[in-house]
């Protein structure tokens, strides 16, 4: 009986969606399968060579079942990319099932002034954390680049290569060219507004993954995907271009995000990472000659609702989208956790053939609990006009309220000790615990103890003990996740 085979080690190369990578791996590696401590096949009699790949599939079928292997192979074909603006969000993304994360460091990224940003030193730590967890790391270098930026651009990309970042995301030819010249993989940003096959053919010389314009509908995306496979249109890696598209989060009112409102109003360019969210304000529309205010549907005439695609995710994947990008580098870990977890479950459900309305309804509920401005389908299903939010700020059905910090964690019994610093904690409260290493832990309190005695609540100034489902750490912050009233 075969007793010493690791199924995941076998699955990794054999279930790769990339034929070239599969062939290279099999040609390069020996495969030893052992029985009862005795070599069944070793250095002198390798069972699996390039010419006997089919035998490997028989072994996989024996070990884990053909359906599971095919499911894992298919899952490797799809990627959920999560936004990261803090270490809390990074760990939340990883723990929720993200396949990759994208982030920026100081300067030359589209959130350099409007969201949390990491330093060059953080770059090495983030890349190491991602490698440790088997998650790809993408660095955004996606602003307009001027001549005076070129030296900084090269330093950033050099640091990305040195740190082992998986790829950069670019929207300007300068970083594309430089990254390729030093062997750094490039993904192309939605800022390029790629809407047709001719543009894709041109940009294929730079990148293996391309974000198509979010103004396209799914029929147009499917046509581009067919062209990629039929020609085929190959990236620098020699494989067909992979299509990436935004799946969830805030949308810009301008075409592919090329907005000039901030520059016009405040002298700060959104295309240089300094968006001041001018579009999110309420406005009155008046006739300049008469002073009469014109009646419009709502005051937020330039603030789009957020994109949500989970209810037609199957159509996106069927159309050829392979990388699902989630917007939200300025959002907290609770947002990242909820959105990544929902889309992870949705993709897995699609692959398992269990994607249905009941599950969509449950995912919708969880997505509505965290930051959003209301939802719409974007332009993906053929809608030509945008949908605008009716209120300022978030329409989330829940809000987090800070109440305590973590003092200790007792790993043997799975209990945390917490100092209540504001308000109170009650049995039945849903709470969030966040920290740079912890990421986010979300659960409902079943029991509280103060000085070993069970109580219904712990108030400001008290130290309490609560059973927690995952490890937490000293200094982690504790929030109540409670219902909120949404403006109508």
Q: Where are each of the predicted segments found?
A:
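Extreme N-terminal basic, low-complexity initiation segments
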Residues: 1-14
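Well-ordered mid-protein domain cores that form the structural environment of catalytic cofactors
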Residues: 153-189
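Surface-exposed amphipathic alpha-helical tracts and adjacent flexible/coil segments at the periphery
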Residues: 72-84, 89-96, 100-112, 124-127, ...
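Low-complexity, intrinsically disordered or signal/transmembrane-proximal segments
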Residues: 4, 29, 61-62
């Amino acid at each position: 009986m075969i007793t010493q085979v690791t199924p995941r080690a076998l699955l990794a190369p054999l279930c790769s969606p990339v034929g070239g990578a599969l062939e290279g791996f099999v040609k390069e590696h020996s495969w030893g399968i052992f029985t009862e401590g005795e070599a069944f096949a070793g250095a002198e009699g390798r069972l699996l060579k390039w010419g006997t790949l089919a035998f490997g599939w028989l072994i996989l079928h024996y070990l884990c079942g053909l359906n599971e292997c095919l499911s894992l192979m298919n899952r490797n074909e799809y990627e959920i990319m999560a936004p990261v603006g803090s270490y809390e969000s990074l760990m939340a993304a990883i723990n929720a099932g993200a396949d990759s994360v994208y982030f920026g460091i100081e300067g030359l990224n589209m959130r350099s002034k409007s969201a949390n940003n990491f330093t060059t030193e953080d770059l090495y730590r983030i890349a190491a954390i991602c490698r440790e967890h088997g998650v790809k790391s993408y660095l955004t270098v996606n602003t307009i680049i001027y001549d005076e930026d070129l030296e900084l651009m090269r330093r950033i990309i050099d640091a990305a290569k040195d740190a082992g970042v998986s790829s950069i995301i670019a929207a300007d030819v300068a970083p594309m060219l430089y990254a390729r010249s030093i062997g750094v993989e490039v993904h192309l940003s939605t800022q390029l507004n790629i809407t047709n096959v001719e543009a894709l053919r041109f940009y294929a010389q730079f990148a293996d993954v391309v974000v198509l314009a979010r103004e396209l509908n799914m029929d147009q995306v499917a046509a581009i995907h067919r062209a990629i496979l039929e020609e085929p249109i190959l990236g620098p890696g020699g494989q067909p271009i992979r299509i990436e598209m935004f799946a969830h989060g805030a949308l810009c009112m301008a075409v592919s995000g090329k907005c000039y409102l901030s520059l016009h109003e405040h002298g700060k360019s959104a295309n240089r990472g300094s968006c001041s969210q001018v579009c999110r304000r309420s406005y009155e529309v008046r006739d300049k000659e008469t002073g009469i205010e014109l009646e419009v549907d709502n005051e937020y005439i330039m603030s789009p609702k957020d994109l949500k695609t989970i209810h037609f995710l199957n159509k996106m994947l069927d159309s050829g989208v392979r990388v699902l990008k989630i917007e939200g580098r300025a959002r907290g870990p609770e947002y990242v956790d909820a959105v990544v977890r929902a889309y992870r479950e949705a993709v897995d459900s699609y692959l398992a053939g269990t994607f249905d309305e009941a599950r969509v309804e449950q995912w919708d509920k969880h997505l509505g609990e965290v930051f959003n401005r209301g939802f719409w389908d974007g332009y993906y299903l053929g809608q030509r006009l945008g949908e605008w939010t009716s209120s300022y700020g978030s329409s989330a059905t829940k809000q987090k309220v800070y109440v305590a910090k973590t003092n200790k964690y007792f790993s043997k019994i799975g209990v945390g000790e917490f100092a209540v610093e504001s308000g109170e904690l009650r049995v039945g409260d849903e709470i969030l615990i966040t920290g740079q290493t912890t990421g986010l832990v979300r659960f409902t309190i079943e029991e509280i103890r103060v000085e070993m005695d069970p109580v219904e609540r712990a108030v400001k100034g008290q130290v309490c003990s609560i059973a927690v489902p995952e490890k937490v750490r000293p200094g982690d912050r504790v929030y109540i996740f409670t219902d909120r009233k949404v403006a109508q």
